Amino acid sequence: MTPNTTEGYVRVERRGTISHIEFFHPQSNSLPSDLLAALAKSITDEGHDPAVHVIVLRSGGDRVFCGGASFTELASIRAETQGLAFFSGFANVINAIRRVPKFVVGRVQGKAVGGGVGLASAVDYCIATQHAAVKLSELAVGIGPFVVGPAVERKMGLSAMSQLAIDATEFRSAAWAQQHGLYAQVVDDAAALDAAVDALAERLAGQSVEATVALKNALWHGTEHWGELLLERAAISGRLVRTDDAQSRIQAILSK
């Protein structure tokens, strides 16, 4: 199953009871709205299929896990409704991960920026390579990590999230991210990453379905309001991205 997008892809591959959902975009695995919609739909569909016991979320390529929002699309936003619609795409992906009654394992092979940190935070268990540095860059482009913030704070705590959000031009190492709870494991390279992810997915696929559902619900307790919260946060980002300041910063990045 391969949802069609204008550029890039979201692909779903079943390996027994394990579903691998992979996204790719030629611009550093950035996420335009069509890929976000396809990703949310794939996670929801696979997560509610009884034949699937665990989901692995991954990206194509070997250098960058996810570059965050598509700057090309951000530069095209002219109305608040457009901004809300775009940032709601990230909200929908995070909420899809939260709502499915299956564990979602993250495979992070390289750098995660902005929304990419949000994806790594939203998965139930994240394994990364030593190259998987993280950065919340939103403030530097005149916005802020409003949509992904709740997921990052839930996983790493307010202090670590604040450091990332305020130091918006600085990468933090994979070791730092592991120390602060984002990554459960950090391995040397892609081969070790695949081995660790596959081993965990196989173990989880063999666990009790009923116990998995109960544990996932318990782990996400207190986030029941995120359906509304993340859309409220998307509205903030959607308003800010239209400002002259944000658009000038976005254009400066695109012109590099």
What kind of region is each of these model predictions?
Residues 1-58, 95:
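Conserved CoA-thioester-binding segment of acyl-CoA-metabolizing enzymes
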Residues 2-22, 165, 169-204, 211-224, ...:
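Amphipathic alpha-helical segments at domain termini/boundaries
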Residues 21, 39, 57, 70, ...:
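Terminal peptide-recognition signature
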Residues 36, 71, 90, 149, ...:
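A general structural signal for well-ordered alpha-helical segments in protein cores
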Residues 42, 89-100:
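Catalytic-core regions built around general acid/base machinery
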Residues 59-93, 112:
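Glycine- (often His-adjacent) and acidic-residue-rich active-site loop
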Residues 96-208:
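Crotonase-fold acyl-CoA enzyme core
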Residues 232-236, 240, 251-252:
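Intrinsically disordered, low-complexity segments enriched in small/flexible residues
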